[in-house]
């Protein structure tokens, strides 16, 4: 059974209103109230059942670099209000900054954005597309699952934003090669779980970073993994385990795996239960 949306049919005007409200939202509670009806509307438009009664997740794809989650699992990620809020706000600011830079350049051109791992909704980007003209923004959409790309094509046409799309590609983002002259101002990918386990975020960025323009940015700009010890009422930060950024992605692509290693000196602490805490911090943009 498809979830019920308050919209008879979700149209571009509602999508724009949602995007503008999400850009103003300052907490996850507000974002949750905003996104639920829109997400349900997208499910209805694409005939995707977000929470089927029996779900075996058989459409996930195991790659050499991690698990590419199924279209349904990718769609379920949109239910996370804080993820949606901060990514949309950070991505909007990144696009706006690049548009402003291009407008002041001698040879103005659209911002070129690559979205790797779109899922069936292109959720982090789709609501923002009507806010930019085709002359300001052109996107390349990349996903490993043809079912996802088919549904996303339906949405692009329904919301009349297909003219913002330069190319749609069904391919493994860790192997895909763009046209020789293609370079991107922004490369967006959110293909990760906590501690960057299982999913191919690291492999995707280490491969795709070579296709950034000289002043281009990865979105998110940084993903920082750190470790800490917790006991009684004490919290002792051990330090940084790994930082995924444009710089480190380029080092990994060059075969430098030393940055994947870390050593810490343990502090003195009283005998008793001690927890090792592993934290993931994500910097979307600036």
List each language-model region with its residue ranges.
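Conserved hydrophobic residues forming the short capping helix/wall of the S-adenosyl-L-methionine
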Residues: 156
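Phosphate/oxyanion-binding active-site loops and adjacent basic polyanion-contact surfaces
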Residues: 76-88, 117-124, 144-148, 197
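Short helix/strand-capping turn motifs
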Residues: 47-50
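Class I SAM-binding transferase module
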Residues: 2-14, 19, 26-44, 54-64, ...
